[in-house]
Amino acid sequence: MKLLYTEISYSMTEILVKEARAYADKGYRVFYIAPNSLSFEKERSVLALLPEQGSFAITVTRFEQMARYFTLAKAANRQALDDNGLAMIFYRVLMQLQEDELKVFHRLRTDQAFIAQLVELYKELQAANLTAFDLTTLDRPEKQEDLITIMTKAEQLIAQGDYDQSSRLAQLAEAIKSKSLDDELRQTVLVIDGFTRFSAEEEQLLALLNEACEEIVIGAYISQKAYRLAFTKGNLYEASLAFIQQLAQQFQTKPIYTTSEKVFDVSFSRLTQLLEANHDYSKLDWQLSAKDKSKVVIWQALNQKEELEYVAKAIREKLYQGYRYKDMLVLLGDVASYQLQIGPIFEKFEIPYYIGKQEPMSAHPLVQFVESLERGRRYNWRREDIVNLLKSGLFGRFQEGELDQLEQYLVFADIQGFTKFSRPFTLNSSRQYPLPLLNQLRLAVVTPLQQLFKSQKQLGASLLDKLMTFFKTIQLADNFEALAGSRREADREKDEEVWKAFTGILETFYQVFGQEKMTLADCLALIKMGMQTAHYRTVPATLDVVSIKSYDLVEPHSKPFVFAIGLSRSHFPKQTKNTSLISDQERASINEQTASYQRLDVPSFENIKKNHQTALSLFNAATQELVLSLPTSLTNSSDDVSPYLKELIALGVPVIEKGKNRLSHSAADIGNYKALLSRLVAINRQGIADDMTSEDRNFWTVALRYLKRRLADEQLSLPAFEHHLTTKPVAPEVIETRFPSHQPLSLSSSALTVFYNNQYKYFLKYVLGLQEPESIHPDARIHGQYLHRIFELVTKDRTDAAFDQKLGAAIAAVNQQSAFQQVYQADAEGRYSLEVLKGIAYSTAPVLNLNQGMQVAKQEEAFELALGHQALIRGVIDRIDQLADGRLGIVDYKSSARVFDIGAFYNGLSPQLVTYLAALKNKGQGLFGAMYLHMQEPRLSLSDFKVLDDQLVAAAYKELTYKGIFLAQAKEYLANGSYHLNNTLYETDELETLLAYNEQLYLSAVKQIKTGHFLINPYTADGKSVQGDQLKAITRFEADLDLGYARRLVVLPVKERRQAFLTRMNEEIKHED
């Protein structure tokens, strides 16, 4: 074994390539081994250093892939399971285990995260040359027992599928021990680059290869100064030192210092030397020069978006200087938080990029299809699962409009379960659903699903055949191809990888579970688990892209220009978290009991060494310029400066406060078409910034004027998102069609209430005619109709029967009416609602019997009230009562508590009672009032009563009173009845004021409606919160941001509140006159 080390300013890759080429020239087969995370980039750099740009004698690969070269012929018919297959294996094992067979993990049997942890533990035990039986020092013996049970059954299933149970490295080790590869290995040389540690499995293999191969060459970056130190704890090179020294001791060889012909920029090595001195407690008598400081710089931006835009502009600027995209590397401190923002910003600046990261498939439509299919079977045709299955776009050939209609009907008719799906749709409503079309769609959905779901327990291979027939029937492959064809090229590549993973999962299922009997539910659950845990990785279509990856995967001298962003304290250094099933303490305890070449990694123990090594690689990642950046605000929370960056700042590395992106006329701002257009749009929205220089302001003013002129020629306009709640008037011809000018505008009190609640809601409901989803299940409207009908029959009954008998007969008659039978007898929920309503009827109806001096004159009385030629008000009055003197009163039944509030009326939110009074007064009828009757079952707190006597009954009846507007002149007729008269009596002139103001409310609304301009203005009572309907899903109204759009109600002090509102009404009436 030959161990080589060199200074960070030299190229270890060049040194090792030179070694590899020398052995290749002698006729040896050379394997150039790199870590998994660096193998792709390492292959490029190695081939670039070879004079021929390639060699058949030198293979750049990974340990596992090298093992395949030697063992492929020995295991020709056996394959290793990938992570998806292992996830399916463990899920099947956990499905078969009973709850009492697992003492610790029994509650996690179906947990996806737990299954992922089992997969990782299985692979980790292989790499550590351990089994579950070796985990003898876990905190709880029951934990080891559970793991032994799970792992043993998993290995049995793997053997059943004739898959390899051992890793490729273990197979190669066994082959070497058997001497079957001696001849090949004598002509083999290994060159190992980029490692600072080996796993136990790799160590064992390396020891065997050292005896069998011609030579093993291993290189690492270590400074001569660090190599000579006796104490290396905390040294910047500690990881590499420990790595090389351990190998030197084990294989009895002395590391050799060497250099390369290529020497990188001395500025980076000078910075490294200063950092090294900080960590080995030595001193240097020099500092960074001006040239050194020009090579390394620290940016501090406001947030992630600003940070990425500065990086994008810097990349564009390098392009103008003649560099290529492939010369740039972007490193991320936290990939998850930056990944979503990179795409839009880099696309705006037209920068092609590649993120070298595995992505989960869970959000892909194919995974959603599989999940919905499995849930549809498991939950017996649950509606949302069937709808999600259809909406995936992979089931059959349906038009989007057809699916919308089907979904609406399924919600309306409450279609749940196979029984309802299998029967023809017959229910309909006033909306007249197209039942023939819907039944055609129902058959197209139900027929293939029913054929699949009726499959009985059988061999997995048979179930898979039925599943493939189902896929063919619904045209899954064709639909997937159509879906991929409609997407961007980058997404099409992802689709291809997802399809490969899907077919691979089906093949694995056939191989492992093909001869095992199981139910269809188990079959679908296994495939779903494989899909949920699957990941995919795409490769760039071209090499000329900006590479993006996590900063801890970088190696020295990667690219000429490196931008490392997001280097806040939270992410630089990285804090390793152990999320496995075995804690760090348990790992350390296990390692103490194991033999040589058996070892579990203990992440926290290696954390400091690993972070120092990462920082060393990062600070030397660039060959020309290095930018280290951090946002002051990271995902909406401020973060401190990284300790490594603090070191650099102390050494004199300059810090640039980037601040907010300023618009200028520099090449970085105007040299790219999309970015320039984006900036012009931003200026149009925000205006020319005051802090621009006069030259910049002139440039952008002229550019914006030019753009607007060009857009006007093309009949286009710039969006104005800062006024995102500003609405446009409806075209006059549309208003004329909807509300003809020669006809009065038809309104109702409820429509007027909607208008003053939020004008835009009126537009949606009464102009566009949008309707809320309906249901066959009874709602508040149906409940109200039911009680109305009962009260109508009771009041019409003029027989001498007792009141309770009349009420019972009315309830029985209403229950027999088909309209109510259909909704209240359909299911248990409806029957329960019916019992509740009967209780309310028995509680409220006695009020009808208390006012003996009152007669019911009319019920369900329709009316029309004309306001000149401008408006026609229509409505229906629930009940009209008549006093002995002939005066009429209006009763409106309510299912919730309501009172007449003069403030709400003034603000247009409660016009109903006054509108009804106006309708009767218009007919020349005398009036005594208008009132609400709350249909309820009074609820009283018994703790409020000392004695359960007649006071309890009186209190119950007090809740059942008429509340509203009453004429003071009628008080003597009402005093002994069930009327709430406190502060509800109005004089005749006051009532006239209410009626006149009510007319003004209608006419003002009509005037605004006729303009066709409807504001998004939900009302606010206190100016702090919004009480009106915000319609967030449609308008994007946010109360905390858009409070200025809300309509502020007029709110007056409680003292003399009624008189104050009446005064304001009179003033406004006079003003209008």
Curated annotation (Swiss-Prot):
Which pairs of Cys residues are joined through disulfide bonds in the record?
Answer: none
Q: What is this protein called?
A: ATP-dependent helicase/deoxyribonuclease subunit B
Entry keywords, A to Z: ATP-binding, DNA damage, DNA repair, DNA-binding, Exonuclease, Helicase, Hydrolase, Nuclease, Nucleotide-binding
- Short name of one Pfam family for this protein? ADDB_N
Q: What EC number(s) does this enzyme carry?
A: 3.1.-.-
Source domain of life is Bacteria
Q: What does the record note on quaternary structure?
A: Heterodimer of AddA and RexB.
Example GO molecular function: helicase activity
Other remarks in the entry: Despite having helicase-like domains, this subunit does not have helicase activity.
Q: What family does this chain come from, according to its entry?
A: Belongs to the helicase family. AddB/RexB type 2 subfamily.
Per the entry, which co-factors are needed? Mg(2+)
Q: Which HAMAP family match?
A: AddB_type2
Q: Which GO terms describe its biological process?
A: double-strand break repair via homologous recombination
Q: What does this protein do?
A: The heterodimer acts as both an ATP-dependent DNA helicase and an ATP-dependent, dual-direction single-stranded exonuclease. Recognizes the chi site generating a DNA molecule suitable for the initiation of homologous recombination. This subunit has 5' -> 3' nuclease activity but not helicase activity.
